[in-house]
């Protein structure tokens, strides 16, 4: 399968674990003070954005398992102009920094460098780089999503659901979307798609928005 960079529409050589996401036209803070602000970072809205199949699979074997161009465009439109925070593997899957956004890469390596990106060695450091920013997006991978969820830092979840079950290669390590706890999160019915959007590439798709209870 050929995987395309969502901005350039060109093939990428190492599509490991990047998940194409989604978007709102505007992202109001659901509380007087956002979760990330309470943590001391002063970020207006800290959103997490991803795409998943019917089994909540994000990818497997270091690869994306689908090609849905309309969702790629939705991700680009949503994140344009805002910082994006991602793990090193997710960045490498893109093949390059995404233009029009601050690209912040999480890595434990002190030697890792890449053009047009900022390096952070912890989630805390990445959030500090974005202090007093109106909107920040977490764009992968599974480990980063899980850490943000466990710390209770996110203000908004934007989830693309794909009307498909991905074919996972045998013996592959599968990356799954984080669990959305219904005690903490509620579906925003005013913005979420009720019906599937038309098929694009491999699947029909819809966008679901979750806000804190």
Predicted features along the sequence, with ranges:
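Enzymes that bind and transform nitrogen-containing heteroaromatic metabolites
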Residues: 2-10, 14-213
């Amino acid at each position: 399968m050929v995987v395309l960079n969502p901005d350039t529409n060109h093939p990428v050589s190492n599509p490991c674990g990047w998940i194409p996401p989604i978007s709102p036209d505007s992202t109001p803070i659901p509380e007087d003070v956002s979760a990330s602000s309470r943590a001391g970072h002063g970020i207006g809205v800290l959103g997490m954005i991803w795409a998943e199949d019917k089994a909540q699979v994000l990818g497997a074997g270091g690869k994306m398992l689908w090609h849905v161009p309309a969702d790629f465009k939705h991700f680009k439109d949503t994140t344009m102009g805002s910082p994006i925070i991602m793990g090193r593997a997710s960045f490498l899957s893109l093949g390059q920094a995404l233009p029009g956004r601050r690209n912040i890469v999480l890595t434990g390596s002190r030697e890792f460098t890449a053009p047009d990106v900022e390096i952070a060695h912890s989630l805390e450091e990445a959030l500090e780089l974005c202090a007093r920013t109106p909107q920040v997006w977490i764009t992968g991978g599974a480990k980063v999503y899980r850490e943000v969820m466990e710390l209770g830092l996110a203000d908004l979840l934007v989830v693309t659901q794909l009307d498909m079950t991905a074919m996972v290669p045998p013996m592959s390590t599968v990356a799954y979307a984080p669990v959305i706890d219904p005690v903490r999160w509620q579906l925003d019915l005013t913005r979420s798609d009720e019906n599937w959007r038309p098929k694009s590439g491999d699947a029909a798709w819809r966008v679901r928005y979750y806000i804190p209870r």
